[in-house]
Amino acid sequence: MAFKDAINKMVSYFDTDEVNEVEEEVTAAKMEEPVVQEPKQRPIPSQQTSRQSQNPAMNRPTVARSQQTESDSLPTYPNRQESIDRRSSGRESVTASTARRETYQAQTTVQEGKTTIALKYPKKYEDAQEIVDLLIGNECVLIDFQFMLDAQARRCLDFIDGASKVLYGTLQKVGSSMYLLTPSNVSVNIEDMNIPNHNQDFGYDFDMKRR
């Protein structure tokens, strides 16, 4: 009996060793299971990275579209050379118009500076008023009294002389029966011809012509 009990103890001992080995294998398997399951859970970050890798590709068209819209929204300016040419042409037109204006003004000034001399042969006293009207219009008048009598010529001459003083004109004798009436803006230089002064008494040295 004692021998049998010893055999049973030895058998039970070996049985417990097997059980312990089985338990150790089970615990080792359980410890290895999370290591095996981790690769199954890791695809989640890989999916996120793949999505992130796909997102830039999807975002690129939007960036290109935004750049295209910005380029479309930017104002289009003309070429600098064209703008310079337009400015130069505008300046040339302005200078041309200015030159034309100055030429026109110069021509107008020359025309205004021209002096007209009217030759009058008064035959009656009423003609003196027409001569004074010409003086008012800033015209020079050359008066020849050869068709008037002495008395009428003196009356007409006195009237014209008084009007010339009122209008700041000048009356000068240029011949035996001729007088030059000029406005204030005209000066006349007459050479000394020993002509008597018109303010002095004088007599006509020619035969008065009748009408």
Swiss-Prot record:
Ranges of compositional bias, category Polar residues: 44-57, 64-81, 91-111
Organism superkingdom: Bacteria
UniProtKB keywords: Cell cycle, Cell division, Cytoplasm, Septation
InterPro entries found in the cross-reference section: Cell_div_SepF, Cell_div_SepF/SepF-rel, SepF-like_sf
Principal location listed in the UniProt entry: cytoplasm
Tagged with keyword Cell cycle: yes
GO cellular component: cytoplasm
Pfam families for the chain: SepF
Compositional bias ranges of the Acidic residues kind: 15-26
UniProt key word Transcription regulation: no
Chain segments carrying region Disordered: 15-111
Assembly notes: Homodimer. Interacts with FtsZ.
Physiological role: Cell division protein that is part of the divisome complex and is recruited early to the Z-ring. Probably stimulates Z-ring formation, perhaps through the cross-linking of FtsZ protofilaments. Its function overlaps with FtsA.
Protein name: Cell division protein SepF
Organism: Streptococcus uberis (strain ATCC BAA-854 / 0140J)
Upper classification of the organism: Bacteria, Bacillati, Bacillota, Bacilli, Lactobacillales
